[in-house]
Amino acid sequence: MSSLFCTMVEKAMGGLALKHGFQVTERGRSLIAFETTKVEMALSYDDQRSFEVGLGLSLKIDPPAQPSHSFDELLRALNVPANEWSTGYAARDVEAAETIVKKMAGILERHAALLLNADPDAWVKLGEQRRSDCIAYAATTKMAHAKRAADEAWVAKDYQKVVAALEAVASELGKADAAKLAYAKRAVSP
């Protein structure tokens, strides 16, 4: 299976790899890695559990600053239209994985040439996308924790805890949760 996957990826990525100077640096059971003097790209296929194809892209720096950027990050940072990538990553077999890898190669060719050629501005933009994603994730997680704590306190009619949970995120609350906070504040006011 692995050699079939690696052979298929080499064929599907061949034109892209040649155009941007990538060489195969690693072939494993279900992983193949390419690199230039400045960029690393790895494709993997989990044929044991998730049956998903993965792609990671990273700028070669010493020491490596972060994990490689996922294909999802690339799609967001490059503003790839949804109609170009309307599929997921699951592939029940190597033939289905080949379809996914070919789509990935096409998107990289059309949208990621600057990244593949190690353009500093393109990599800064990709890094900014990751930071933006992290900030959004942290805000979403903070809100979810606050709402969960407030909901538990609400059921217990512990309005002091409702206020404590929601006050930190008050500016981000929707109408219903803002009303819940206002009610809880009135309930604990002397």
Question: Predicted segment positions?
Answer:
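Intrinsically disordered, low-complexity regulatory regions enriched in serine/threonine/proline
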Residues: 1-12, 24-190
